[in-house]
Amino acid sequence: ASSKPGWYLMIVKAVLNGREITYDVTFNKPEVYLMGPVTEAGDWTVKEPWALFTVPTTADGEFVSPAFAHDGSGNDSPRAYVIIPGHEKNWWHSEFIVGISGDKISYRGKGGDQKRVDGKAGQKMYLNFTTDTGKIE
């Protein structure tokens, strides 16, 4: 835990021990990454340093991606994710995108790929987790 205000990625792990549930709570840096063919590498490389979003300094601020290096549409549209320690190979378990409405964050969860907004080289992804909104421009 921290006494410093700011953005954190809170991870809660629950383990069933007989009839009791034990919780382990950790607070990590809020590292949000851009993913996919729109990145500088143009592929599905995990934790690409170039792909790290900037973190807002206010409670209602936006996480902002680097400018897309390439166009992306359909399954190659811009995606974002956070890494849950121990799940680096399954980054899509913590994936989110700007949904097809163009103004809401859509979380993948356990489902398949969602419909997403296309992106053009030079555009950025903006995510506001306080209002659960996002945009690509």
Q: Where are the predicted features?
A:
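Aromatic-rich carbohydrate-binding modules that target alpha-glucans
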Residues: N28-N75, P85-K104
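C-terminal edge beta-strand
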Residues: A14, I21-F27
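Structured interaction patches on ligand/partner-binding surfaces of diverse proteins
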Residues: A1-N17, E88-I136
